[in-house]
Swiss-Prot record:
GO cellular component: cytoplasm; nucleus
Main subcellular location of this protein, as a coarse class: nucleus
Similarity comment: family membership: Belongs to the bZIP family.
Subcellular location: Nucleus
Stated name of the protein: G-box-binding factor 1
Subunit structure: Monomer and heterodimers with BZIP16 and BZIP68. Interacts with GIP1.
Feature: compositional bias, Polar residues: 133-164, 178-187, 249-262
Ranges where the record places region Basic motif: 224-243
Domain (bZIP) ranges: 222-285
Posttranslational mods: Phosphorylated by CK2.
Leucine-zipper: annotated span: 250-285
Key words of the record: Disulfide bond, DNA-binding, Nucleus, Phosphoprotein, Transcription, Transcription regulation
Length: 315
């Protein structure tokens, strides 16, 4: 038994590190420079190398802006920092179902089960061969090493095939996932959305003041404009009515004057006709006097009539 135990080969186990070694910082003089920047008593923000994600922003980046007065502007929120390597989904596009971890767990369980079975079989074979005689020690050890190597290779091949099948899903599975996602309409997975910061505007406070005081000013100007238009319309209407009244008065005066002129013409025509009649009568009377009294008597009468007219004019 002693010789068989001494001749049995044993596998050297690799020492496993309990904790992952943290790589050194890329800037060894970081602490001194940050103390000089922040002051002797200040402690800088934690900084980790690229393999380790940090939820806090880098110390050399500015934080949120200080609060300012509302009339001059509002503080713009600084967007949150996310760990590197994350996938940000578009708001209008759904994300595929995150079925990777669920499928990997059964594969790991199967691989661990197979490895445990292979180890138990190897331990049983090793015990049986140790109990057998020392004559078959060399052959048993060689067979055991061959079987152990083949079992390890088979396990590794099986694990690689399972991982390949998990990493490369079939076309049917992809169609099924797409159809289930389109029917349910729910986005699976906890991928954070990138927040959209509001657009900066330098006239925020001015807009607040102008929006509050601009409405009354606009209303007052509009009222003044309406009143001015109304007064202009009323003055134009009054002037139009006054001119219309003057035109009507002038028209009436023209009509009255034209009627009076026509009446005067008619009177003149009547008087002229009467004058003609009187002249004709006078001529007829003179002719009859000359025929009765003679021409000398008629001449004396004319002289007497002219002298009487002159005396009346002098008196």
């Amino acid at each position: 038994m002693g010789t068989s135990e001494d001749k049995m080969p044993f596998k050297t186990t690799k020492p496993t590190s309990s904790a992952q070694e943290v790589p050194p910082t890329p800037y060894p003089d970081w602490q001194n420079s940050m103390q000089a920047y922040y002051g002797g008593g200040g402690t800088p923000n934690p900084f980790f190398p690229s393999p380790v994600g940090s939820p806090s922003p880098h110390p050399y980046m500015w934080g949120a802006q200080h609060h300012m007065m509302p009339p001059y502007g509002t503080p713009v929120p600084y967007p949150a920092m996310y760990p590197p390597g994350a996938v940000y989904a578009h708001p209008s596009m759904p994300m595929p179902p995150n079925s990777g971890p669920t499928n990997k767990e059964p594969a790991k369980d199967q691989a661990s089960g197979k490895k445990s079975k292979g180890n138990s079989k190897k331990k049983a074979e090793g015990g049986d061969k140790a109990l057998s005689g020392s004559g078959n020690d060399g052959a048993s050890h060689s067979d055991e090493s061959v079987t152990a190597g083949s079992s390890d290779e088979n396990d590794e091949n099986a694990n690689q095939q399972e991982q390949g099948s998990i990493r490369k899903p079939s076309f049917g599975q992809m169609l099924a996932d797409a159809s289930s996602q389109s029917t349910t309409g729910e986005i699976q997975g906890s991928v954070p959305m990138k927040p959209v910061a509001p657009g900066t505007n330098l006239n925020i406070g001015m807009d607040l003041w102008s929006s509050q005081a601009g409405v009354p000013v606009k209303d007052e100007r509009e009222l003044k404009r309406q009143k001015r238009k109304q007064s202009n319309r009323e003055s134009a209407r009054r002037s139009r009515l006054r001119k219309q009244a003057e035109c009507e008065q002038l028209q009436q005066r023209v009509e009255s004057l034209s009627n009076e002129n026509q009446s005067l013409r008619d009177e003149l025509q009547r008087l002229s006709s009467e004058c003609d009649k009187l002249k004709s009568e006078n001529n007829s009377i003179q002719d009859e006097l000359q025929r009765v009294l003679g021409a000398e008597a008629v001449a004396n009468l004319e002289q007497n009539a002219a002298g009487s007219k002159d005396g009346e004019g002098t008196n």
